[in-house]
């Protein structure tokens, strides 16, 4: 029931935000970060030798399992 409430609230939060495109003459840039947490029951991780390049940081590690990928920033480890 709690996950249903979160799913129903998420679109209303997105549609209530107003985002405009920055003009070339403006000196400031506005950024918007939206985080979404998905909890999967019975997550079985499998070790992989993959890594992904994160544009805002260094490399990240990937763990896969049940169709989900776990990406972690190595700067924060």
UniProtKB/Swiss-Prot annotation:
Pfam families cross-referenced by the UniProt entry: Pox_T4_N
Highest taxon above the source species: Viruses
Signal peptide from the UniProt entry: 1-17
Keyword Signal annotated: yes
InterPro entries hit by this protein: Apoptosis_reg_M-T4, M-T4_sf, Poxvirus_T4p_N
Record keywords: Late protein, Signal
Induction comment from the UniProt entry of this chain: Expressed in the late phase of the viral replicative cycle.
Family: Belongs to the orthopoxvirus OPG195 family.
Listed name of the protein: Protein OPG195
